[in-house]
């Protein structure tokens, strides 16, 4: 472990994680700036930076298309697009922009904290449940989700929902947290044992950093894919 702690503050008797707030805001700001820059001067025939934006939109829509029908793809397209970009950027921040002072982290990957990833998981679940109720009505949706194929299925259905919530959020947290910890360990080796350790550690850090970029990208894809599958279970007719 790195020995670093997080920054917090108190408000109305509640403790807030300053590190997560700053990191999440920075990630959101980066996403906003990138999308804003790519979406200027849109043309009917895309060229240059507009191609990049449309490729990302097509990519996330394609993920949805594999799980839901065309109508639901339109309903959740913006959510999938935003979710993918936010998670992708959040996964990479800790590799390039970590900021700490006096062993207190102020900027790191937001997704390296289970509170953040479980919150994203909860948002997805709430959106899926809301959409299911809006489409089928509460009674039919409840029966479809928790009482099918048998009424005694209710405890298993509730337990399954809880497991889905945990696995969706904790999978990405485990990968990103482990990646950051390993980078910190390699960095500690580089600066604690002289020039020989540094010569060995720096190439290892670069290799692992490149691999972590790949893992972060894959995890963003996996999260959105699982999100689309989860949503499809709630809004699609069986």
UniProtKB/Swiss-Prot annotation:
The record's comment on protein family reads: Belongs to the ATPase A chain family.
What is the gene name?
Answer: atpB
Could you tell me the membrane topology recorded for this protein? Answer: Multi-pass membrane protein
What InterPro entries would the database entry show? ATP_syn_F0_a_bact/chloroplast, ATP_synth_F0_asu, F0_ATP_A_sf
Q: Which HAMAP family match?
A: ATP_synth_a_bact (MF_01393)
Signal peptide feature range? none
- Quaternary structure (record): F-type ATPases have 2 components, CF(1) - the catalytic core - and CF(0) - the membrane proton channel. CF(1) has five subunits: alpha(3), beta(3), gamma(1), delta(1), epsilon(1). CF(0) has three main subunits: a(1), b(2) and c(9-12). The alpha and beta chains form an alternating ring which encloses part of the gamma chain. CF(1) is attached to CF(0) by a central stalk formed by the gamma and epsilon chains, while a peripheral stalk is formed by the delta and b chains.
**Could you tell me where this protein is found in the cell?**
Cell membrane
Q: State the organism named in the record.
A: Pediococcus pentosaceus (strain ATCC 25745 / CCUG 21536 / LMG 10740 / 183-1w)
Keywords of the record: ATP synthesis, Cell membrane, CF(0), Hydrogen ion transport, Ion transport, Membrane, Transmembrane, Transmembrane helix, Transport
The biological process GO terms on file are:
proton motive force-driven plasma membrane ATP synthesis
Domain of life per record: Bacteria
The keyword Mitochondrion belongs to this UniProt entry's keyword annotation: no
The molecular function terms in GO held by this entry are:
proton-transporting ATP synthase activity, rotational mechanism
* CDD domains the record matches: ATP-synt_Fo_a_6
Cellular component per GO, a single term = plasma membrane
| Protein name as catalogued | ATP synthase subunit a
Q: What does this protein do?
A: Key component of the proton channel; it plays a direct role in the translocation of protons across the membrane.
The uppermost taxa in this organism's lineage are: Bacteria, Bacillati, Bacillota, Bacilli, Lactobacillales
> Does the record carry NAD as a key word?
no
Residues that span the membrane, as ranges: 18-38, 76-96, 114-134, 150-170, 188-208, 211-231
């Amino acid at each position: 472990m790195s020995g670093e702690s997080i920054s917090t503050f108190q408000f109305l008797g509640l403790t807030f994680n300053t590190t997560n707030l700053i990191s999440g805001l920075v990630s959101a700001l980066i996403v906003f700036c990138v999308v804003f820059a790519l979406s200027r001067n849109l043309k009917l025939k895309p060229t240059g930076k507009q191609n990049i934006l449309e490729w990302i939109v097509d990519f996330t829509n394609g993920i949805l298309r594999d799980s839901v029908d065309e109508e639901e793809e339109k309903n959740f397209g913006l959510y999938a697009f935003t979710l993918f970009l936010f998670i992708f950027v959040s996964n990479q921040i800790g590799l390039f922009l970590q900021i700490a002072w006096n062993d207190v982290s102020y900027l790191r990957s937001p997704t390296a904290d289970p509170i953040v990833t479980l919150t994203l998981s909860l948002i997805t679940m709430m959106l899926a449940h809301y959409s299911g109720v809006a489409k089928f009505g509460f009674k039919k949706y409840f029966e479809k989700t928790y009482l099918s194929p048998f009424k005694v299925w209710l405890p298993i259905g509730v337990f399954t929902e809880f497991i889905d919530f945990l696995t969706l959020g904790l999978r990405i947290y485990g990968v990103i947290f482990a990646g950051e910890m390993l980078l910190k360990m390699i960095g500690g080796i580089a600066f604690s044992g002289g020039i020989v350790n540094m010569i060995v550690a720096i190439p290892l850090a670069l290799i692992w950093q490149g691999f972590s970029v790949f893992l972060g990208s894959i995890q963003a894809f996996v999260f959105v894919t699982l999100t689309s599958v989860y949503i499809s279970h709630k809004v699609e007719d069986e």
